[in-house]
Amino acid sequence: MDGMQLFSRPSVAALLMIATACRLMPTEAIADGAFVVDDALIGKPGECKVESWVSVASNHDFLAVTQPACVINAGIPVEAGATLLRTRSDGEWSTSAGPKAKINIIPLGDQGFALGLSGNTLWNLNTGQNIGSNINVPFTIQATKDLRININGGWLYDTTVHMGYGTYGAGFEWNFVQPLTLIGEVFGLAGQRKEGRHVTDPRAQIGLRWTPAEFIDIDVIYGRNLFGENANWFTIGLNLRF
């Protein structure tokens, strides 16, 4: 099986789009890194970060991701970055990469909510073929000082199977005690089940984030059915801000 075939399962190509969609956030934002559900915030021009994580599954699938990003001034602040990922699925390896960007449409102010827009695309570096593209609209509600709720909706086109999917997600970030944050989320795809009954089943993650200093996060996460393969996933992540 070559790299293109590795992503022939719509669940894998599609979830990679969601999981690596533009989740580039400022220092005060929480659910970035390996978490899928995005918030609507971006940072200030000149802020940069690198998010990296490794995930292993009970069925022996594997995912390693690194995402460098900086906020630039392009008339409006834009978080521009790239994704590089290495995957193993059904025993076969593949490498993919692509650009992504995010803007904030409604800032998080006294009204207690914010709205954003992000998009990304990926290419399989083994074959040179585009895997797919994703657009996402994140909506953030600051429920309390220590509790934030994020709701996502969007669209994904998987070029490996020439199918489109609606995308959805909802999550919470609860900073119940310094320096720990509990983060949980449910997300998935809406559309025709072309392959595999678990492709459009809901997916979920819950994890604990330790922030020993304002420039670093360490994540430990448990996930279920992350790529529509009905497996358990364990993730360790590291986020650096500068």
Where are these regions (language model features)?
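Transmembrane beta-barrel domains of Gram-negative outer membranes and organellar outer membranes
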Residues: I30-F242
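Cleavable N-terminal export/targeting peptides
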Residues: M1-F35
